Amino acid sequence: MTSRFSLLFSLFCALCFAFSACEREDNPHILWGNGTPPALPTPQPQPSPQPSPNNPSPNPALPLNAQQRADAARLEMPQLTGENGELFIVHRVANPQGRDSIVNYAYAYLPQSYHSRWVAFRFDAQTRSKVVGRKPYDAKPQYPRDPKLPTAWAIPSDLPFGRVYDHGHLVASADRLFSREANDQTFYMGNMSPQLSSFNQKYWTGLESLVQDLGRNRSFADTLYVVKGGTLAPLSSFGYAANGKMPVPHHYFMALLKVKNGVYSSIGFWVEHKNYGKIGVPREMGKHAVSISALEKLTGINFFHNLPDAVERRVEQTLTLSSWSL
């Protein structure tokens, strides 16, 4: 009797263990290299949509230090949200005059997408000059891991995007030619987006050339503020690159704000990511133009929010193509 009871008890324990083993799921981790990534940064609450121009904090809930808060208050910076573990990354370069370092460009990075939400920079007296050329093609790595991103949430150096996608610069190499360091920083993987080769090398360059020509034209603008990016929402992207980690945007956008003699004006561009079968011509880019107000609705991004509210409303609702050589 005792042996029969022991046998039944053993069978019961074995079944319980089997069921518990079947119900347990491993928590998958994305591994770059040999380490296990840390938890995503804790999402922060949504900020108020219109910060006071007298206190242009991007989001008081974001854990920004004093320097980051100052950088986030620059006119080119869209509003930070703190959602989905958003990271605010700023790349600076040495000032050839030996003064404070120069902000080269910045971006809001979404770790779960391994892609930036937007990149932002400006053409001004310090950054519009053309002193150097493109980073040499034989330089290795050609596309380094961004050293400012946590290793676990950064795309590794030179990771291929697949046969049909290029490493598409968001801040173009030709946007940053004022120093060797500034140009080299545009090749960081954090500045890359998977773009169709025909789009990256032909059509998109038409819009990039327009922006570069305007940004370097002192008679056009004292400062040209630029924001670029691609759509990342699941319904706004098609497929993934970088070993299935990085969404391929369905659209790319640009938001431009210029100031000349204290007068502001703006324009947005909304461009479908596809093979256009031709080289983009700068003067034809007007077909993709939209107001900043419309672009904000398309992207969910609050552009140029550091302007005084009255100026922001006027500038973002007005679109005059002739003011942009279109």
Predicted regions, residues:
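Bacterial N-terminal signal peptides that target proteins for export
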Residues: 1-9
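Bacterial N-terminal signal peptides
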Residues: 9-18
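Domain-level detector for secreted/extracellular nuclease and nuclease-toxin modules, and
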Residues: 22-326
